Amino acid sequence: MVKRMHCNINLKYGVIMKKDCYTLRISLKPGFINAEQLKAIAYVIENFGDNKAHITTRQGIEFKISPEHLEEVEKILNNVGLNLGSTGNRVRQVVSCIGLECYNAIGDSVSLARRIHEEFEGVWVPRKVKINVSGCPNSCTFHRFCDIGICYRYKITINKEICTNCGKCKDFCDLNAIDWERKIIKDNCTGEGKCTGLCNAFKAERVISIFVGGKGGRIYKEGKHLIDLKNEDDVLFVIDELISLYAKFGKGRMADFVENYGIENLRNNIKELIK
């Protein structure tokens, strides 16, 4: 695995220097925060800050304090399992949807996101790397618009031998991804899997899709599909390889690396390693 860069009080990591204060950013583990941690944050911002905190777009929390309270505040946060982070040229806090708490979930996105977070958050990279995990194709975490996006979905196929030509599926898909006459699923299928309830001819295989090279911002890009995997261990393996290649050859953002390296070259390299 990629070597972790251990950081504690580092004004470039989790601490943003302002003119008359520090802004501290907490790197939260994906999914949920407990009551004890919320109480600690409330205590800190009430006693050392300006009595308010900001919820970041990556599900983190940040707030202002006076510089002289940095060590004391960090100790209070550490005592309840909270750490500063998610700034600078590092792998940032991993974002997840609510996973199995949602009735649309195809996979446990929270558990996978936490594994990724624990393994890679804080690792040095040429530019910041954002990783988002969605439990289904609804894309609540906008996994196609971040450096590495992960999505649980279904690969749908039609068994032509079982199909009775009943026509139930002909106009069922709002994406028109079912070719009823040829009995195939088109490439624009998102893998939601609702069509599998129509009849036994539809078969669904759960996969974990990885997208790479997306980003938000003023000049946004949609990530490109890299590979479909069958288990979470392989997901961590692929992320490790992506970050290693990016750390070695990357200069701009991950999107620039993918463009320069070539998505087909990247796909071929990853597929060879997964065999």
From Swiss-Prot:
A Pfam family that the UniProt record links to this protein: NIR_SIR_ferr
Binding, [4Fe-4S] cluster: C97, C102, C136, C140
Keywords: 4Fe-4S, Heme, Iron, Iron-sulfur, Metal-binding, Oxidoreductase
MF term (GO), any: heme binding
Gene3D superfamilies: 3.30.70.20, Sulfite Reductase Hemoprotein, domain 1
Binding of siroheme, residues: C140
Source species, domain of life: Archaea
InterPro entries: 4Fe4S_Fe-S-bd, NiRdtase/SiRdtase_haem-b_fer, Nit/Sulf_reduc_fer-like_dom_sf, NO2/SO3_Rdtase_4Fe4S_dom, NO2/SO3_Rdtase_4Fe4S_prot, NO2/SO3_Rdtase_4Fe4S_sf, NO2/SO3_Rdtase_FeS/sirohaem_BS
Similarity comment: family membership: Belongs to the nitrite and sulfite reductase 4Fe-4S domain family.
Descriptive protein name: Uncharacterized protein MJ0551
